[in-house]
Amino acid sequence: MNMRNSDILKLLNGKEMTGRPVDFKICTDKVHKFISDRRYGAFGEAYVYGWFISKIGDLSQEDIKRLGYSSIEEYLAEPFNKGLTKDSEKKFIQWANFKPNWEVLDKINW
């Protein structure tokens, strides 16, 4: 069973899906060059710099556009639209924390 967009809203509202908090990690270093080659994922060749934002709403419109999306909802919905299931929740949490996980990226034909 595919996760629904309503499940994404639970994440956005800071609720727990797995019995533990979900934090989102993002690289917004303005010096870093983002590329559009999707083989590398939504962040291009970006590295994870290790700072966290506690709420996805802390992303600015500039950050969202830099990632190549019109809205944060569109960005978060993409892995679900590509067929991740509730059974893939643990892997999604890794993806949601923006840790490169090539097994998942390959699975969703990134």
PLM regions and their residue ranges:
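Structured alpha/beta reader/binder surfaces that contact nucleic acids or chromatin modification marks
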Residues: M1-W110
